[in-house]
């Protein structure tokens, strides 16, 4: 992306994520009093003294333990260092150096990037200098006493850091498409992201809940830039403790809001679940473009009716996103994965599309001719005066009528179907705003008002 990268390294629970949030000016990396909360590489933009760069939050390093995720976390930290221009090694000033710090320091001395030693949790400036002095023994140069929570000392650290960052020679205007990858735990979201990125960017494991942060990955295809946001799987509320998992779900919903297009990942073996339906409803509520990705398609036993039956099931159970394209893929084998980005680009274009008022009213005129608006019990018929598009993302059309409450849900759905049949809008929700307007207000409008239906 053109910006230098700074990797944040350290053993568990020394305050790496807190420092990342301090440098980035926001709480995006999950911070919780539990060792090993951050498992993946989380990229955030940072800015200091007219210099822009990215900070990369990595999992807590442990070298003498190979249980559960720890070897994978080491792999992620090494990958972060390989793409970094510098590293900040975070240690705990309150506990002093220990054997784990010494192991990490020895490992960092073998890496080809400059390393800056941040002695965190030095809340008192006077006492902090004494605490930091104990870390000279790690052999990484000057220890910088800091408080990631309060910001003390971070300025001095950053002043020295930016001296070692390479200049940004060219930073192009980036017209990127932001994509949120969401779904229940263990449906293959991280495998899908890695298939896009061409590397093991995110820890992949059959253990549910492996990915906890919303993580941004940048890729480019055919001149188009994409920002991929992988999120923790979304579980039913009753199975969530109000700890780290709660914050991850909140982060996933925020990722939907950030996105231009959402990939709703369905497990082909499990089919559409109640939780998938709720996610589809969330996408609709947020007004986001969507592509439904049925993953693990390679594991499904197939006959000549399989795809037909599956499509019927999706249509029946995912009615919230019936307007979305569906693609059947295997993130493991790579089957049809690249095709997803084509659908994303198309959905994004439809999401931002604007239609002229004259075309909208031609559609309305045809729709009313084929199916007249409903009539009230008193014999008064509903009447659509005109329509005009008032916004995009999602496309939103205001319909001015004689009495909005006269138009029941069935007729409103009929009008939406007519817009879709005539104008497309594949991959994006559309919103219709029904507005009551008196006849005299319509007739006294300016000469430039929309064509009356």
Curated annotation (Swiss-Prot):
Positions of the EngA-type G domain: 4-169, 177-352
Regions annotated as coiled coil: none
Alphabetized UniProt keyword annotations: GTP-binding, Nucleotide-binding, Repeat, Ribosome biogenesis
Single GO MF annotation: ribosome binding
Signal peptide (from-to): none
UniProt cross-references to InterPro entries, sorted A to Z: G_ENGA, GTP-bd, GTPase_Der, KH_dom-like, KH_dom-like_a/b, P-loop_NTPase, Small_GTP-bd
Binding-site list for GTP 1: 10-17, 57-61, 120-123
UniProt binding sites for GTP 2: 183-190, 230-234, 295-298
GO biological process terms held by the UniProt record: ribosome biogenesis
CDD domains documented for this protein: EngA1, EngA2
All copies of domain KH-like, residue ranges: 353-438
Quaternary context: Associates with the 50S ribosomal subunit.
Cross-referenced HAMAP family: GTPase_Der
Record-stated family: Belongs to the TRAFAC class TrmE-Era-EngA-EngB-Septin-like GTPase superfamily. EngA (Der) GTPase family.
Annotated function: GTPase that plays an essential role in the late steps of ribosome biogenesis.
Record protein name field: GTPase Der
